[in-house]
């Protein structure tokens, strides 16, 4: 039987685009997430917001904070708090490695995206270091310069 392409069965549900602007991404890791039934349905519909969310290692477990999952419309009494803390599912060795990173000054854990992989909801978690204001300005200036160069080259080649 033919092998399936691994990229074919990944469907991105939500991304944290601000994370790349506000942080230097050091390392990424894939984690499962513990959700209730109506939360799963809401996430599959794309009603999730990663803005201002972060993760923290506590007592050998990793929890995701400030991630908003809108209540499922047809969930009535089964809906839970949209901003509740959610446990991330990782191996103990991965948790220990992340804890070592986070103990260093300036490092934090942030979710980059939520996606479906083989029917399971996964979170791409990043070890990140915050950018200073001048770093952000430098990145914007560099991006603008590259855009200007591309425009000039396109104009020149016409």
UniProtKB/Swiss-Prot annotation:
Protein family membership: Belongs to the SmpB family.
GO biological process assignments: trans-translation
Stretches that traverse the bilayer: none
Record PANTHER family: SSRA-BINDING PROTEIN (PTHR30308:SF2), TMRNA-BINDING COMPONENT OF TRANS-TRANSLATION TAGGING COMPLEX (PTHR30308)
Keywords: Cytoplasm, RNA-binding
Native species: Caldicellulosiruptor saccharolyticus (strain ATCC 43494 / DSM 8903 / Tp8T 6331)
GO cellular component, one term: cytosol
InterPro entries (UniProt xref): SmpB, SsrA-bd_prot, SsrA-bd_prot_CS
HAMAP family linked to this entry: SmpB (MF_00023)
Subcellular location: Cytoplasm
Name this protein carries in UniProt: SsrA-binding protein
Keyword Cytoplasm: yes
A GO molecular-function descriptor: RNA binding
Xref: Pfam families: SmpB (PF01668)
Function: Required for rescue of stalled ribosomes mediated by trans-translation. Binds to transfer-messenger RNA (tmRNA), required for stable association of tmRNA with ribosomes. tmRNA and SmpB together mimic tRNA shape, replacing the anticodon stem-loop with SmpB. tmRNA is encoded by the ssrA gene; the 2 termini fold to resemble tRNA(Ala) and it encodes a 'tag peptide', a short internal open reading frame. During trans-translation Ala-aminoacylated tmRNA acts like a tRNA, entering the A-site of stalled ribosomes, displacing the stalled mRNA.
């Amino acid at each position: 039987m033919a092998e399936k392409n691994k990229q074919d069965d990944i469907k991105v549900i939500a991304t944290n685009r601000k994370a790349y602007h506000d942080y230097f991404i050091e390392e990424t890791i894939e984690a499962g997430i513990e959700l209730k039934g109506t939360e799963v349905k809401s996430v599959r519909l794309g009603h999730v917001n990663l803005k201002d969310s972060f993760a923290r290692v506590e007592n050998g477990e990793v929890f995701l904070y400030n991630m908003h999952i809108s209540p499922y419309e047809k969930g009535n009494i089964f809906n839970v708090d949209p901003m509740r803390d959610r446990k991330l599912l990782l191996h103990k060795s991965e948790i220990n490695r992340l804890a070592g990173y986070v103990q260093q000054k300036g490092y934090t854990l942030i979710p980059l995206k939520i996606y479906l992989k083989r029917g399971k909801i996964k979170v791409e978690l990043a070890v990140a270091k915050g950018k200073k204001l001048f770093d952000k300005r430098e990145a914007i200036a560099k991006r603008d310069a590259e855009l200007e160069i591309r425009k000039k080259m396109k104009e020149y080649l016409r």
